Amino acid sequence: MGYLFGKKSFRKGKALKKYKVNQGICCDGKYIYSVFERKKSHTCKIRKFTFDNKTIKVSDKLHIGHGNDITYKGGNLYITHSKGGNVIHVVSASTLKKRGDQHVKGFPKKISDHPSFNAIAAIPQGFALKLMGSQRIIIVNDNFKYIRSFKMSKKIPVSPQGMEYNDGKLYRVYSNFQKSKNKVAVFNMKGKLLKTYHIKVNGEAEGIFFCAHKFYMSIYHKYKKKKHKKKYKARLYYLKQIQ
């Protein structure tokens, strides 16, 4: 495990000055996309950048809620709104402009009358969505039509964050705020817990993505450099212990 950019933050540039909290993160195989939230305005921006931390593009202000998870598929970015109801925001990966919204079709009312989602991962069949306030994963096709669902077999007793899919398994990030007790839990596609990794790094784990046979985890690190002055860093880690 190690820093991808050494001690440098991947939140950089004047465009992100007021967008201090990194949220969801993903990769298209070449570029990395990270959501940054401006908490007081409840708006976000997306930074598209390279593996050597060079900015390709920063989006304009986006009304995408908390923006707590993001995934890439077919030229688009799909972003969870968290408490915004049955909606997934769609943003062009090339222009970083919003293209519209998707809604899960045929969602069973016996599961939830008012579903919302706080994690998303692209999978071969379509997408896996984490139902807000539940241990349930929803599987939809590429048109967001409901296929099936399952419950994760074990609740991890810290805050759930982003999610990634690879080789028939879901990788879910958990954090304990800024207490540096971060975890990655691995589940199969029936919800069975296969393994839990304990990641001891400074800050709060926010997201995870897989690229070129490697896993990476994003960290939101809040600290005080001077008295009464808070500093924020978005740091990216290579998780070499996860194969």
Over which residues does each language-model region extend?
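Short coil/turn segments that connect the beta-strands within blades of beta-propeller domains
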Residues: G29-K30, G74-N76, P124-F127, D167-L170, ...
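Beta-propeller domains
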Residues: G2-Y3, Y33-D60
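Structural motif
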Residues: S41-R47, G85-V91, S134-V140, K179-V186, ...
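Blade-loop segments of beta-propeller domains
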Residues: N53-S82
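Loop/turn-rich, solvent-exposed surfaces of beta-rich toroidal or solenoidal domains
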Residues: K154-F187
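Repeated scaffold domains used in trafficking and secretory/extracellular systems
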Residues: K18-C26, H63-G74, F107-A122, K155-E164, ...
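A short beta-strand motif characteristic of beta-propeller blades
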Residues: G6-K17, K54-K61, K97-I111, Y146-K154, ...
